[in-house]
Amino acid sequence: MGIAVGGKGFGRTAGEPTRYLRAMSTDGLLTSPLHERHVALGAKMADFGGWLMPIEYPGGGVIAEHTAVRERVGMFDVSHLGKARVSGPGAAAYVNACLTNDLGRIQPGKAQYTLCCNESGGVVDDLIAYLRSDDDVFLIPNAANTATVVDLLQASAPVGISVENLHTAYGVIAVQGTLSDEVLGSLGLPVGHEYMSFVEAEWEGLPVIVCRTGYTGERGYELVPMWENAGPLWDTLAVAITERGGMPCGLGARDTLRTEMGYPLHGNDLSLDITPVMAGSAWAVGWDKPAFWGKEALTEQRAAKTSRLMRGLLVAGRGIPRSHCVVKDASGAEVGEVTSGTFSPTLKQGIALAQLERSVAMGDTVTIDVRGRGLEAQVVKPPFVDVQTK
């Protein structure tokens, strides 16, 4: 199946109104199109970016869900993620002049990790850009930052460029793990396309975008159905996944999986104060492009080589580091701060991502202050486990 550049999956049929179908829960948080299914399963729900989302399900919780993805397959509702479309003559060139990465490096049908920065180099959001054509780019920002990203792109858009907030026009279901191809294949969906590419397909006569992307470090896919079609697709996937020893997974497992890979989380490891240079995301910056938001500030910071940098921390004994814990060197001097920390179900020990001074070298032993208790840790380069995405 080829890539459809002008089809019905991303975007709307002419004259069709934008959908605003998201529901409000009783406590004012937004809910996904799969909310009632999570409640029926007994999921533990919590606020995530202003959305009431499943953190874990009964029957094992985070560790079992994490292990299912690493060893077999799991499925996540990530419909809280934003969706936006930039279209019109030269839309890709416009996006390329705003966001950090270089869309010129990829062809239509491919996706690219990129960042939206402010003029001081701070990260407004990190997102995935799906290049449909020179005149059509689909974006997946983070839930809490979607409106801000859309507003910024709308404010600078030249005449003829349309920027649409389609947050609730689509659901997103991630199927991740070594058996993900088998699961999708059993539904008649396309599999086997290159990592960071996407195919426009149909399931039961309904449009769905099959993206070879994910946030777990495992081989997998992210499916983008229309909002109202997410439920039936989820139900069918659940049967196929359960038959193969997998399970629905909450955002708790998604967080431990991404931390093991060293993938940054906006608000923790990337922020208005933590730039791409500091976060180890300079690879997602098109330094040779003539312009992008924050280029001057980031170029200066990159050349100065004085900022803190993201490093991994592997805890030697028992204990779990958490965000904002202070990191000290052997002399007791403060040399950094944890930005993300968790227990690694794969390694069965504490791990963390931290912003550390450049004087701290790989292999050094440091101490993490966790509520007055010192945890010894080794400085390492993420990922903490092998990458299996391809």
Question: What kind of region is each of these model predictions?
Answer:
Residues 20-49, 53-57, 65, 130-390:
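Conserved, structured C-terminal
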Residues 89-123, 178-206:
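Internal amphipathic helical hairpin motif
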Residues 18-114, 122:
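Acidic, proline/glycine-enriched N-terminal capping motif
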Residues 1-23:
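N-terminal amphipathic/basic-hydrophobic helices that include classical n-h-c signal peptides
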